Amino acid sequence: LANVKLVGRMNYHKTSNILFDAAHNVDGINGLVAALNAWHLKIKPTLILGVLKDKDYHEMLDTIVPVVQRIITVTPNNKTRALSADELAAELLTNYQNIDVEIASDASAAISLAMRVRESSQALIVVTGSFYTLSAIQKDHRMA
């Protein structure tokens, strides 16, 4: 068991400087934030976030927003449970200041936006919020 690794949990791709973590609930987000804080990053990361509407995403946002510079919202690939990228962006823009928010039409657009932003800052890209979000981005970019 000591060597078991759960796919989608704290998977860092060094060559692309992308961290995949399927923090899909409050406990998961708390763990992700603790890890990001432990890394003592010089530049706050860019977050690609897609969440399910039946999760406590309000508390998840309260925890993650202070440690990131930008959030790119994406709709998870689960039509019945997904919180849309537009709804998530509206929640962020209404309730949080000092955070850049962009809406991606799909996983491919989300990673493209994040890579474009990173060209100027070299910030870590963090993909999180649900296994659906991670799966779509990993498949799209052959990072599985």
Model-based region annotation:
Residues 33-35, 61-64, 86-88, 140-144:
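Short, glycine/charged-enriched secondary-structure capping and boundary segments
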Residues 130-144:
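Glycine/aspartate-rich loop-and-adjacent alpha/beta segment that forms the canonical ThDP
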Residues 36, 40, 92, 96, ...:
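Active-site catalytic pocket residues across diverse enzymes, especially alpha/beta-hydrolases
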Residues 17-18, 61-124:
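C-terminal helical cap/extension that packs against the catalytic core
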Residues 49-53, 75-76, 129:
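Cofactor-binding loop segments of dinucleotide-utilizing enzymes, especially the Rossmann-like FAD-
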Residues 30, 57-59, 83, 136-139:
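Short glycine-/acidic-enriched loop or helix-start segments at secondary-structure transitions
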Residues 1-70:
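Nucleotide phosphate-binding/pyrophosphate-handling subdomain across enzymes
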